[in-house]
């Protein structure tokens, strides 16, 4: 992963999000990253990644039918007076409460990038105390021989 990140930073390419997970082969990790650029930039990125010996495959999902999701854990300060309204909002948006106490609520929010941004904006007025957010994970709707 360090060589991949180094390839990006050394060439002036930007990584917007990065997520790493295991595959069915414990010797292989899948790195899903989000970047941006025009078509020439994306082609250059792909060529640079293919030069890294340990890279087995590079798939550009641009223009392909795919599912992309992010996840955020959001902690909100909560008073007894706010609780009914907050629970209604959580229920309406189908967010999941993963922990709560007398003065806080931690929820799990999943969706695309825009849905996460909306959730953070909706929760900010409640006294959003902190949040942690994953990078995007993605899968093409049709298999293109992607490992794991």
What are these regions (language model features)?
Residues 1-29, 34-148:
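Long, contiguous binding/interaction regions
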């Amino acid at each position: 992963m360090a060589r991949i990140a180094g390839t990006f930073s050394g060439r002036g390419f930007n990584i917007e999000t990065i997520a790493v997970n295991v595959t069915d082969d414990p010797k292989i990790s899948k790195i899903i990253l989000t970047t941006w650029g025009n078509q020439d930039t994306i082609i250059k990125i792909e060529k640079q990644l293919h030069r890294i010996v340990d890279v087995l495959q590079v798939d550009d999902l641009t223009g392909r039918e795919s599912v992309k999701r992010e996840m955020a854990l959001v902690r909100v300060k909560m008073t007894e007076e706010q609780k009914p309204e907050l629970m209604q909002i959580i229920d309406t948006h189908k967010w999941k409460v993963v922990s709560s106490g007398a003065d806080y609520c931690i929820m799990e929010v999943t969706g695309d990038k825009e849905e996460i941004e909306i959730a953070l904006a909706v929760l900010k007025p409640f006294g959003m105390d902190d949040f942690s957010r994953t990078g995007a994970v993605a899968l093409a709707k049709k298999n293109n021989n992607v490992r794991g």
